[in-house]
């Protein structure tokens, strides 16, 4: 019988964790446990239904200061700065307001990053960022946010927009005018290669990604220096300072739709400022490390972005830049260097930048999907000390697929998922609309979760104060949290405002708010799915859901959510602590129980 169809008594890769009841306490209806991970001396106090702390990260502790900076920089400096200036300038209407928007994006990232950092101070030994923070901020209804975030993470775990930009700039390296399907084919091939680079070794993948990050920074610095050369009048560009005179001319022509669209492009361009928070359990002393180096990465990118925009505007007339689409950088190189081979080489460097961005996105998504997978629904019945295995389904089905790091020490399941969904998006959406639609679709649900997370920060503060828990190592200023909440509300509400040209005058060839409805539909589908399996099915079939802490291969710790018949709830509660760990070690076999001696909280009982 295949291992995934066997009862747990016949499986060799799962064990039930045991507990000595240390570090447990209650706050009303909520039960909390305190655990320490291998990356920090700070205790992670979390609501007991959350995925357990991994005391020794199976992914290692290879994320140091250099990697923190470069994994964020690599994700931010990808396709945004080369592909969004046209839409941002068009939306804001003027050069001056465009620069204000880039600064607004930087301030928003600081405010949002402060929220991430305070949550990390509360849960320093949990990777996955948003899924952990939402799980702990809103533990009731049980598993609601892990479920909805897990499903939307899977549905939105694609990088097709970056892949399309990669393909576009690769074709710019040649003289060929590609067809729609040629762009799709190269985009899919590029994304596949990026996935393969990450599959075989985590440490070497980080090294390779760091190397690309250095190249990306140097490329942007070269563009900036070239821009200053243009401003100095040392090229054939005529009147390079023309765009900076009357910098706010045209601001009055900006519409509400255009300003909202510009803000979406800004948010997309800074996407990745929080990427290292996904790897918190792989970072030693995560709060101080992320505070220093994530902020350094964000500030570095902000400065580079501002000067890069100066470079674009020094060589490309305003009207020409507004209509350049995704290829502002190619236009810049063409105006400065002509049609020389150097232009093709620089286009390749931008394609390499997009490739590095794809890798960084895959790394962050894989950690979030893995964290979602560590809270998995297992349809199992506990009857008279006999565990009858039926099948597995739920929050994210098939625990080993999501959380296992075999055979290469990398999360193959999440990598495959991101590749499969990206391939579908690349092939399904017209390449001309793919970048705008996908980038907008990713921002809208993200804004909803960021809003919930910022509000949830106040909920966590209130609960911890009431429970008399220690003060966190870092606490965000109120003004930053409030600013973050207001911007997220703006991002959620304003996309409904139509463009001036009518329903089909947006930045895609179809209805302007398609991405809004799609994003809301995804969120509603997640909520309906949760209600079905968490409430309707248990009510119809007469059981309750309870989580059990298990240990999988390589020490990976996860939660199995079991179906326990109502008449056996008392037995379950008597044999498990609030975190789902066995209070005593009882081996469950198909023919009857076998008692073994109790163990400490670090021991395991085979099931």
Predicted regions and their residues:
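Extracellular loop-to-transmembrane helix junctions
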Residues: 59-63, 70-73, 81-178, 297-300
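Loop-to-transmembrane helix boundary motifs in multi-pass membrane proteins
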Residues: 140, 182-188, 284-287, 292, ...
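C-terminal membrane-solvent junction of multi-pass transporters and transport-like membrane proteins
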Residues: 400-412, 450-520
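Membrane-interface "cap" regions at the ends of multi-pass membrane proteins
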Residues: 1-92, 109, 538-607
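Helix-loop-helix junctions that connect adjacent transmembrane segments
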Residues: 21, 29, 57-59, 102, ...
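TM-loop-TM module centered on a large, flexible mid-protein loop between adjacent transmembrane helices
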Residues: 128-141, 249, 299-359, 396-442
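Membrane-helix boundary/coupling elements in multi-pass transport proteins
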Residues: 150-164, 270, 274-282, 341-398, ...
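Membrane-interface loop-to-helix entry segments
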Residues: 183-240, 271, 294-299, 439-450, ...
